[in-house]
Amino acid sequence: SSHLLTTSYEAKLITNKLSFGMYSFHYFTDAFCDELVKDLKGFDGWTKDRHGNYPTNDVLLEEYNPNLHQIYSTCINNIVLPLINTVYEGSTFKKENFNHETFIVRYKPGIQNSLRLHHDSSTFSIILNLSQDGVDFEGGGTYFPQHEVLVKPPKGHLVIHPGKMTHWHGVRPITSG
């Protein structure tokens, strides 16, 4: 097998089910997240209207850092995709036909502190906190009203959820940070 999680048993051991169709696991170290955030603070190429219906203050990972995008894509193909195929029983996604648009969103008071409720256009979506709630920012979190769940993953933790129909969500306001 060409991926790092060689059995479905391994995938299930590292994954926590948060709610219907929502799974979380630790993905990046705090040190990696801290270095990336430090680097992003000096970045000035943030967009405000790249998504027509639900614009976010973001940057495509591929435009921000092509080398990091390549590494991240390898991680998606070798860790996340096999995990999706395990926790979403019946999924048979292959890396050859699995595309992703990875972007980093910045929520900040005075720039964009929230995002209204919406469905993503993706089959699956990933939420990954690079900062720690209560330390680096206050407020926020991704709210799923149909599931009555507020997701605030710890720094470095990833949350996967279906994108299109079943997981309507929005980001609650960041109050500081």
Model-derived features: where do they sit?
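Non-heme Fe(II)/2-oxoglutarate
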Residues: S2-E96
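Catalytic core of non-heme Fe(II) oxygenases with the double-stranded beta-helix
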Residues: L81-G177
